[in-house]
A protein has these predicted regions:
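N-terminal interaction modules that seed assembly of large macromolecular complexes
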Residues: 53, 58-124
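Charged, amphipathic alpha-helical oligomerization/scaffolding segments
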Residues: 67-74, 93-100, 104, 130, ...
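Long amphipathic alpha-helical segments
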Residues: 110-179
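Acidic, proline/glycine-rich low-complexity IDRs
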Residues: 159, 174-234
Length: 234
């Protein structure tokens, strides 16, 4: 079976360019990814002549993989500029972007790692904290929410208080490490990055994303209804 391949470095470069050019308008977020993946069979063969018969490395250039890389890069770019938006814009955008990230993660191929070495991590404790604090200040009193889908619930009869900012920083950490590994352009490293990201999605950040999405939905629509009721009372 012939798989579509794309030059990952060019994809990431194009994604960064699109991100810089895109304006995140109020109540609007467009993620233009489709044009990135249509290449001819001749282009595919010429770009990756050494990988044509290598099934293990083929997953790096699968369409589903490239689409996930693109959305992941979009997510990281937006998170890194989260302080430039007001709370409503931030919540509205994530309510569109997070479901797309979850959907594309589900499409990642299931494979095994090639190397036994630990993959490099790029997100530092300082950068993690800067992002978490930025989001926490942006969401203010709406940052905390009650959650029952956490491991600690087995020891408690009441919901656990969680933080949207911490959840998003956790998701960002996994996704940013993944995107950074892809930017290295080393097939074996990219292959193992896919495997690790897929495993972490199933075990950690996938559930965190769903929980956070519920909390963001509550902020977006419950807050709006409460404000409308207050206007009526006045």
């Amino acid at each position: 079976m012939r798989h579509e391949r794309q030059n990952i470095s060019n994809v990431l470069k194009l994604t960064r360019t699109q991100t810089q050019m895109r304006r995140y308008k109020k109540n609007e977020y467009h993620c233009h990814i489709a044009p990135l993946f249509f290449v001819t069979s001749r282009q595919i063969k010429n770009q990756n002549p050494d990988n044509v018969n290598n099934e293990r490395e083929d997953i790096v250039f699968l369409r589903d993989t490239v689409e996930f890389v693109t959305v992941a890069a979009e997510f990281c770019a937006y998170m890194e500029h989260s302080g430039e938006h007001n709370r409503k814009e931030f919540v509205d955008t994530l309510l569109k972007l997070l479901p797309l990230l979850y959907l594309k993660a589900q499409m990642l191929p299931n494979e095994e790692s090639i190397s036994d070495d630990n993959l490099e991590e790029f997100v530092t404790e300082d950068s993690y904290e800067v992002l978490r604090i930025t989001i926490s200040e942006l969401l203010a009193e709406k940052d905390s929410y009650l959650d029952v889908f956490v491991a600690d619930m087995k020891y408690s009869d009441t919901p656990i208080t969680k933080s949207i900012s911490e959840d998003l920083a956790d998701i960002y950490q996994d996704i940013k490490n993944f995107v950074s590994l892809f930017q290295l352009g080393i097939n074996e490293t990219m292959h193992d990055a896919i495997v690790e990201c897929n495993e972490h999605f199933k075990q950690y950040w996938g559930q965190t994303l769903v929980n956070t999405l519920r909390a963001l939905h509550d902020i977006r629509y419950k807050t709006t209804l409460e404000e409308e009721e207050e206007d009526i009372d006045e």
